[in-house]
């Protein structure tokens, strides 16, 4: 998992409340057995004018010019600004995969759905909770200034705007540690690989019958 330390990026404002996971990545794209390739289908039903299906050449599909992520000023955005209860609906880890593979490193909103919130951390996507008043101000700034950027300093736990304003945010110490070091669940386990191998070697000596293959 990629480390998250300090990130500066263009902000894209998604001015909708209760954005659910089916809007983030529609159900037909969940058939894939891979963890990659979801970025082109993030917000598929809002992003394109036709119906999307797995395996399509998305470069040939008609774009919805009214959708915020299709507007030229937000191309290359890596910080998503959203409204309350972002990521609600059914549990699907594909949702943070799609957002991350689109190019987002962080999402700022007044609140998130719990399962989506946890899935973001497990996949290196930083969900930041700010107050509704702070989010309102950032929406106004993002719309008013072309190429509006924010800098997110995870170690300092602060979002910095170009006008000098700072927005502190809370994050659990363990989650912060994992993001700063790029540890997902597998990465955390592999830190103890030597001890795991030692345990398995000792177990094989002490309990050899556990490795006996059953015949018949």
From Swiss-Prot:
Task: Kindly list any coiled-coil regions of this protein.
Answer: none
| The reaction(s) this protein catalyses | (2R,3S)-3-isopropylmalate = (2S)-2-isopropylmalate
Q: Which InterPro entries match?
A: 3-IsopropMal_deHydase_ssu, Aconitase/3IPM_dehydase_swvl, AconitaseA/IPMdHydase_ssu_swvl, IPMI_Swivel, LeuD
Source organism per entry reads Burkholderia orbicola (strain MC0-3)
- The enzyme's first-digit EC class, named in words, is lyase
| UniProt keyword list | Amino-acid biosynthesis, Branched-chain amino acid biosynthesis, Leucine biosynthesis, Lyase
Q: Which GO terms describe its cellular component?
A: 3-isopropylmalate dehydratase complex
* Cystine crosslinks: none
Q: Which GO terms describe its biological process?
A: L-leucine biosynthetic process
PANTHER family given for it? 3-ISOPROPYLMALATE DEHYDRATASE SMALL SUBUNIT, 3-ISOPROPYLMALATE DEHYDRATASE SMALL SUBUNIT 2-RELATED-RELATED
What is the name attached to this protein's record? 3-isopropylmalate dehydratase small subunit
Describe its partners and assembly state: Heterodimer of LeuC and LeuD.
Similarity comment: Belongs to the LeuD family. LeuD type 1 subfamily.
Under NCBIfam families, the record lists: leuD (TIGR00171), PRK01641.1 (NF002458)
Is this entry keyworded Amino-acid biosynthesis? Answer: yes
The catalytic activity of this protein is classed by the Enzyme Commission as 4.2.1.33
Pathway per its UniProt entry is: Amino-acid biosynthesis; L-leucine biosynthesis; L-leucine from 3-methyl-2-oxobutanoate: step 2/4
Q: Which SUPFAM superfamilies match?
A: LeuD/IlvD-like (SSF52016)
The record's Pfam families line, in alphabetical order, gives: Aconitase_C
Q: What does this protein do?
A: Catalyzes the isomerization between 2-isopropylmalate and 3-isopropylmalate, via the formation of 2-isopropylmaleate.
């Amino acid at each position: 998992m990629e480390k998250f330390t300090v990130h500066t990026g263009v902000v894209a404002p998604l001015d909708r409340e209760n954005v659910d996971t089916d809007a983030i990545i529609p159900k037909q794209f969940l058939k894939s057995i891979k963890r990659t390739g979801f970025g082109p289908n993030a917000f598929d039903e809002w992003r394109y004018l036709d119906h999307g299906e797995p395996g399509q050449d998305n470069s040939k599909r008609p774009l919805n010019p009214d959708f915020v992520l299709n507007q030229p000023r937000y191309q290359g955005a890596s910080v998503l600004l959203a409204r309350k209860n972002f990521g609600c609906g059914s549990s699907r880890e594909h949702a943070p995969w799609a957002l991350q593979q689109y190019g987002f490193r962080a999402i700022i909103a007044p609140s998130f759905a719990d399962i989506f919130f946890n899935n973001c951390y497990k996949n290196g996507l930083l969900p930041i909770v700010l107050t509704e008043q702070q989010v309102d101000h950032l929406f106004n700034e993002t719309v008013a200034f072309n190429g509006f950027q924010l800098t997110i300093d995870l170690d300092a736990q602060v979002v910095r705007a170009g006008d000098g304003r700072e927005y502190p945010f809370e994050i659990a110490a363990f989650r912060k540690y994992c993001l700063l070091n790029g540890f997902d669940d597998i990465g955390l386990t592999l830190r103890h690989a030597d001890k795991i191998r030692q345990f398995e070697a000792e177990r094989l000596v002490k309990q050899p019958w556990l490795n006996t293959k059953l015949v018949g």
